[in-house]
């Protein structure tokens, strides 16, 4: 989905050279068509639905995680996620125990411990819990790896450059990093946990299939920190979904890094350094 029905994402890497710029090189492409972000030397945050297949009740395995990917170029290597004890995952239990379609959206949050220390070369982002005002009034960004063969309800997978007609429907470059030309807005906080922290918020960062699991991040004291995870679009996903329109200001949703989820990240970083 795209806010105001205009896709303003731009290519964030060369077509042939890996994404070397900081902090974009910390953002991972998943070969199972998701995104994630390194928040430790071998620790990444993503969406629960990128890690756990609810209909089959199985963890996803066999896919590759590639930081800073640009097509067939991966300057920082990649890590294959095997089955067995070499990989550690986390999703809230409520996500895995819910209906076949997956748990409520507020539980769509996942942590992945990679078998390889990719972050030693790329570095990694921080992670933080911001207040509602901190998210609403701050500069929030999203970068991810769109699945170029996936289309919206109008049969279009749009990636528009800044100067292009917003309805031109340009074809994107597969397995490359994209993001809005500027920061995006956030609001509509909902699904409070037991401590009163809203676990979901809506946002205007343009995204499509493949962006799932990508970080919503902000700069705190000059350093990038993950403050949420993009999980879904609220319009325009399928032919039966409501269409995105020019009045769709924040048509996408993210799971927030609450104090509870932040504690889980710290736990896995300490337990599996």
Can you annotate each of these PLM segments?
Residues 50-52, 69-73, 116-119, 146-148, ...:
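Acidic glycine-/aspartate-rich tracts in secreted/extracellular proteins
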Residues 105-207:
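Chymotrypsin/trypsin-fold serine protease catalytic domain
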Residues 2-25, 52, 58-120:
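Conserved catalytic-core segment of clan PA serine endopeptidases
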Residues 22-64, 68-69, 218, 232:
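Catalytic histidine site
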Residues 1-40, 259-273:
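Protease-domain processing segments flanking chymotrypsin-fold serine proteases, especially trypsin-like
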Residues 37-38, 206-230:
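Catalytic nucleophile loop of clan PA
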Residues 19-23, 38-39, 56-59, 89, ...:
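Extracellular/periplasmic catalytic domains that process cell-envelope and extracellular macromolecules
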Residues 231-273:
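C-terminal cap/linker of serine protease catalytic domains
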């Amino acid at each position: 989905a795209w806010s105001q029905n205009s896709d303003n994402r731009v290519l964030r890497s060369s077509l042939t050279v890996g994404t070397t710029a900081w902090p974009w090189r910390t953002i991972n492409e998943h070969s199972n068509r998701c995104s994630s972000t390194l928040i430790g030397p071998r620790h990444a945050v993503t969406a629960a639905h990128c890690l756990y297949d609810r209909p089959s009740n199985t963890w996803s395995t066999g896919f590759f995680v590639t930081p800073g990917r640009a097509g067939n170029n991966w300057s920082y290597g990649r890590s294959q996620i095997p089955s067995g004890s070499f990989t550690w995952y986390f999703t809230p239990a409520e996500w895995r125990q819910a209906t076949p379609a997956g748990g409520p959206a507020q539980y769509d949050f996942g942590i992945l411990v990679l078998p390889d220390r990719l972050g030693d070369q790329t570095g990694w982002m921080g992670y933080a819990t911001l207040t509602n005002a901190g998210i609403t009034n701050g500069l929030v960004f999203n970068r991810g790896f769109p699945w170029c063969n996936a289309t919206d309800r109008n049969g279009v997978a749009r990636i528009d450059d800044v100067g292009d007609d917003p309805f031109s429907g340009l074809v994107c470059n597969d397995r490359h990093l994209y993001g809005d030309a500027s920061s995006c807005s956030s609001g509509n906080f909902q699904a409070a946990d037991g401590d009163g922290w809203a676990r979901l918020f809506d946002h205007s960062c343009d995204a499509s299939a493949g962006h799932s699991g990508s970080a919503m991040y902000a700069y705190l004291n000059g350093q990038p920190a993950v403050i949420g995870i993009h999980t879904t679009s609220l319009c325009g996903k399928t032919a039966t979904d409501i269409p995105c329109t020019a009045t769709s200001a924040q048509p996408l949703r993210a799971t927030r890094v609450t104090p509870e989820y932040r504690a889980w990240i710290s736990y896995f970083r300490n337990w599996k350094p």
